[in-house]
Amino acid sequence: MAGESTQVDLSVKAIGWGAKDASGILHPIKFSRRTPGERDVKIRVLYCGVCNFDMEMVRNKWGFTRYPYVFGHETAGEVVEVGSKVQKFKVGDKVAVGCMVGSCGKCYNCENGMENYCPEPNMADGSVYREQGERSYGGCSNVMVVDEKFVLRWPENLPQDTGVPLLCAGVVVYSPMKYMGLDKPGKHIGVFGLGGLGSVAVKFIKAFGGKATVISTSRRKEKEAIEEHGADAFVVNSDTEQLQALAGTMDGVVDTTPGGRTPMSLMLNLLKFDGSLILVGAPETLFELPVQPLILGRRKIIGSSTGGLKEYQEMLDFAAKHNILCDTEVIGIDYLSTAMERIKNLDVKYRFAIDIGNTLKYEE
């Protein structure tokens, strides 16, 4: 039952990198993971992605970080051991783990493949295992032990180093676009922001067979948006004339910028009748909601957070089929503190991935 705590055999020695307090200083942290059970998969971690969420969790921005904190919700590696009742995986398989390592399994959301909206989730990077009383540590470590249900099969033709950030950036944009029917050919979709999320959103839109228009604050990103990511058009969000010309032309808009920075009325004005505005950037402050454009155009606003296990797997398979990867800088573990500072200063294009397999070793 949720809330119960029982003794767990913690025999798997592990080492990760994380924080001991909210100072932002990172250290090697030794800890133990549970002995693999009959349905568990033991994974040798090879790569772990790093994003803005990790940087903010390290510093306890939202007030619920539990220290010592080992981050990591974008993890890829290979199977080194399986439990006696594991059916999906064998030793040597390439696998991945996203933001979740458990859920209640009984609520409406879990029963309908939306485990990420379970009210009692076990997050990979820091929540407790409510049924077992075990502390959870993230994927920035040499090894993980995870229930096979929450382990994803990694496509053979998808590189793990530049693909591992898809476990955050990829699913965050893939899930709501598919849910809102924007994965159909011919759809015109606007993307606000061309960072880690926006650049991947453009790639998915083009693979769906859609038209992608990037709206950014910086004219400098125009060449990159069109030539590197395949966007069909680019608009600076201060160009009111161009934006007015696009009014009522888009089936959907995906706002990947930090919430509240882009006027809601501006984004809603771009939508066709029945169009959808998707928000994936969390606002730090309240913002005004203009209701009239919603009423007069039957437009919709939705928020979205990652995806269910089925969506995760679909996203990875789709990315492999269409050669969708993230713009990724691969680093060693010793560069992690510098990487976190660069994320804080918006000095990365667009994601970091740590080469865990070659740079993080457990030593007695």
From Swiss-Prot:
It comes from the Eukaryota. Pathway: Alkaloid biosynthesis. It catalyses: (19E)-geissoschizine + NADP(+) = 4,21-dehydrogeissoschizine + NADPH; (19E)-geissoschizine + NADPH + H(+) = (16R,19E)-isositsirikine + NADP(+); (19E)-geissoschizine + NADPH + H(+) = (16R,19Z)-isositsirikine + NADP(+). Coiled coil: none annotated. One of its GO terms (molecular function) is zinc ion binding. InterPro entries: ADH-like_C (IPR013149), ADH-like_N (IPR013154), ADH_Zn_CS (IPR002328), CAD-like (IPR047109), GroES-like_sf (IPR011032), NAD(P)-bd_dom_sf (IPR036291), PKS_ER (IPR020843). Zn(2+) 2 binds at residues 104, 107, 110, 118. The keyword Oxidoreductase applies. Zn(2+) 1 binds at residues 51, 73-74, 168. Disulfide bonds: none annotated. Signal peptide: none annotated. Binds 2 Zn(2+) ions per subunit. One of its GO terms (biological process) is indole alkaloid biosynthetic process. Keywords: Alkaloid metabolism, Metal-binding, NADP, Oxidoreductase, Zinc. NADP(+) binds at residues 52, 194, 196-197, 216-218, 221, 261, 280, 282, 304, 306, 351. Its cofactor is Zn(2+). Residues 24-343 form the Enoyl reductase (ER) domain. CDD domains: CAD1. It holds the Pfam family ADH_zinc_N. Belongs to the zinc-containing alcohol dehydrogenase family. Class-III subfamily. Homodimer. An alcohol dehydrogenase involved in the biosynthesis of seco-iridoid and derivatives monoterpenoid indole alkaloids natural products. Catalyzes the production of geissoschizine and its conversion to (16R)-E-isositsirikine and (16R)-Z-isositsirikine. This is Geissoschizine synthase. It comes from Alstonia scholaris. The lineage of its organism: Eukaryota, Viridiplantae, Streptophyta, Embryophyta, Tracheophyta.
